[in-house]
């Protein structure tokens, strides 16, 4: 046999080409993980650390049977408390709590996947999670490999017990670890907005929290001892100035939904409408197994969800705030628009909005709603009825905490 000898330079070039090809392959694999705001369910708002294999299986079943999966809800995310209080003493790996998950997590995740859903886990950038379980600090690459080996599709990464840590560096390290693990995993930065993640997180993850935690009240701040949580409208007030940072694959996250957790039906509608207008991730946080027909009708309103999931990916903007009625506009594909009129007060308010007298311009994206030269048809997305055109004013009464949400089409 005659052996052919190749110059060392040729071999080096071949190896370099192979390496670059492999890197490009993985880079392509991790692109476009969240072209629209992620939709799913998270365990924390209702269950905190009281989670189990039985709960996960039950939620997965209801996500399908209730129509939520069909409406676009994809991710089932286990929040804090899924792991044991100590890592494996030999390997250093995280260990699923054997009481909550006696069969481990892999069978549970496989079951979620069998339902056509995706699975998410939680951890923290600090030494411990917010509930005192093992954090990821110093274990980023090991934990990322562990998540990938289980088939995890989504990671929520919190910010407790992080004294002395630089936020950008910590989240960048975890982002690199997830990419190196060889599996596409949506990365949710739960940094509470403390270090302005909207300024640096676009190349790091697909969504980032803009505020502290939400709580199930419509407005104001609720104290929980040494920390506090924000009502729906309090969080909304913090979002308008951040819209330029949102877009496909990089979303502002005003926190999970509290629909079905004690808000009134009107407040549920307003909450869901505003999250849709904000192009916010729609992550439900109620007990899906026990939700009322009213809650289900809000969470699965496909017309409202379509506003949130519009492929243009533009976060809406607050147009006006008059007499307790906030007006929000959101540009959509095909030169269509969505508008929300939200009554923030505890008394009914009269709305009189004359399209011919208003100048609706989105300066950030150079878009305008010209109702003088173009007639738009109006559809009420909650009553699911056509309600006229922009040739005539909108005159109606908006009940306390309720919303009028319209889609404008030519």
Q: Can you describe what each PLM-predicted range is?
A:
Residues 388-410:
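C-terminal beta-strand-rich structural cap/linker in extracellular carbohydrate-active enzymes
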Residues 269-319:
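Catalytic cores of secreted or luminal carbohydrate-active enzymes
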Residues 33, 37-43, 72-79, 118-123, ...:
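Structural recognition of the beta-strand scaffold that forms the well-ordered cores
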Residues 1-29:
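Bacterial Sec-dependent N-terminal signal peptides
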Residues 275-278, 283-285, 321-365:
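Carbohydrate-binding surface patches
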Residues 28-53, 57, 62:
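N-terminal module-boundary/linker segments of secreted carbohydrate-active enzymes
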Residues 186-287:
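Glycan-recognition surfaces
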Residues 59, 63-164:
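Aromatic-lined carbohydrate-binding/catalytic grooves of carbohydrate-active enzymes
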């Amino acid at each position: 046999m005659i052996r052919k000898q190749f110059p060392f330079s040729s071999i080096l070039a071949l190896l370099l080409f192979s390496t670059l090809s492999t890197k490009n392959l993985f880079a392509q694999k991790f692109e476009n993980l969240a072209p629209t705001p992620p939709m799913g369910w998270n365990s924390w708002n209702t269950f905190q650390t009281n989670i189990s294999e039985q709960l996960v299986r039950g939620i997965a079943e209801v996500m399908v049977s209730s129509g939520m999966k069909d409406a676009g809800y994809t991710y089932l995310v286990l929040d804090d408390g899924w792991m044991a209080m100590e890592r494996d003493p030999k390997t250093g790996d995280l260990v699923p709590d054997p009481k909550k998950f006696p069969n481990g997590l892999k069978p549970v995740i496989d079951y979620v996947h069998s339902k056509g859903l995706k699975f998410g886990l939680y951890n923290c950038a600090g030494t411990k999670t917010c509930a005192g379980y093992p954090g990821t600090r110093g274990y980023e690459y090991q934990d990322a490999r562990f998540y990938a080996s289980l088939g995890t599709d989504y990671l929520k990464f919190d910010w407790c017990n992080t004294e002395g840590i630089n936020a950008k560096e910590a989240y960048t390290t975890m982002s690199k670890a997830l990419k190196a693990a060889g599996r596409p995993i949506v990365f949710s930065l739960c940094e509470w907005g403390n270090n302005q993640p909207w300024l640096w997180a676009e190349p790091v993850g697909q969504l980032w929290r803009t505020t502290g935690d939400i709580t199930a009240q419509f407005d104001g701040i609720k104290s929980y001892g040494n920390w506090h949580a924000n009502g729906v409208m309090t969080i909304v007030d913090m979002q308008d100035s951040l819209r330029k940072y949102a877009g496909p694959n990089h979303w502002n996250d005003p926190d999970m939904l509290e629909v079905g957790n004690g808000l009134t039906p009107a407040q549920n509608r307003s909450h869901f409408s505003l999250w849709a207008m904000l192009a916010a991730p729609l992550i439900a946080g109620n007990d899906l197994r026990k939700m009322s027909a009213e809650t289900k009708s809000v969470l699965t309103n496909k017309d409202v969800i379509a506003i949130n999931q519009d492929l243009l990916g533009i976060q809406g903007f607050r147009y006006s705030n008059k007499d307790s009625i906030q007006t929000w506009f959101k540009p959509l594909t095909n030169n269509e628009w969505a508008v929300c009129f939200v009554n923030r007060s505890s008394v009914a308010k009269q709305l009189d909005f004359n399209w011919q007298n208003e100048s609706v311009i989105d300066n950030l994206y150079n878009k305008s709603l010209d109702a003088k030269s173009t007639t738009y048809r109006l559809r009420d997305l909650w009553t699911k009825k056509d309600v006229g055109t922009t040739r005539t004013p909108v005159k109606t009464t908006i009940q306390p905490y309720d919303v009028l949400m319209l889609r404008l089409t030519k």
